[in-house]
């Protein structure tokens, strides 16, 4: 038998369990070989499945509870006895292969189960878990999102925006309104990260700004990437919609990060400026250079934005201004009105906050 090098991609195979047959993963008598004159009693008549073909490799079966129970029996026979019968012919497998299985939480496995005999033969069980802290979560999200922030239209992501995006996920994972048995996956963070970057880049292209810098107003696009990824707790959410729950966790995330980044001392001076009737209107398509003009009546706001990030870049400063405004709203110091894609901050009506 010739010796050849297998690339690692060739030494790994996976299969989605629903609809998988015994012949797919173990093997079957090949009618074409029989027609060619090969005897049914010969091993040459066999067409081997994925597991034998992954000798000295790795085979993964996804959604294991959805695998037919008869096929699961064949799986544990290979795991323990290393043999199996194909159409009545005993076949001994001398294979060296690592078998991996994946399964979602029990709430998603209503139509199937893993038979006890197969569970007994599985060497170890690993329960996936959430990142231990926000910093690690940001690293995972940044890595898995795999977004190119450079290129013709670069994007500069402020640290507080990354922190808010990850804190949204953390808040969702701790929310009493969300079914925690189903959980909130990393896909939630990844999709939101990509959405905010795309929104900022879209603004950069439309307005000719380089680099584009994500702002709080870009979070207004999160429903497009978040809705459908949160499973509500029917007992805890009562009459709240998924959109309302999302708005609540976003507000909580902004408040949490704002209190970490911004010193409370001096905030009342900004609030007093709004108490004089000042209104500040922002949007995701407002040019960055325009932020200096719209906050001229509240110079303390402009100064506090510099404390968040001292960059002289107008786009960075615009993002900081929105961050301070959103933080003041989230901590119930000023109010906010949203209409037609624009956000107006003032002290009229009831102060916001959730």
Model segments located where?
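Short acidic/histidine-centered micro-motifs embedded in hydrophobic/aromatic stretches
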Residues: 28, 78, 168, 216-222
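An alpha-helix initiation/capping motif
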Residues: 96, 159-163, 183-190, 217
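C-terminal helical "lid" of AAA+/P-loop NTPase domains
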Residues: 163-167, 187-205
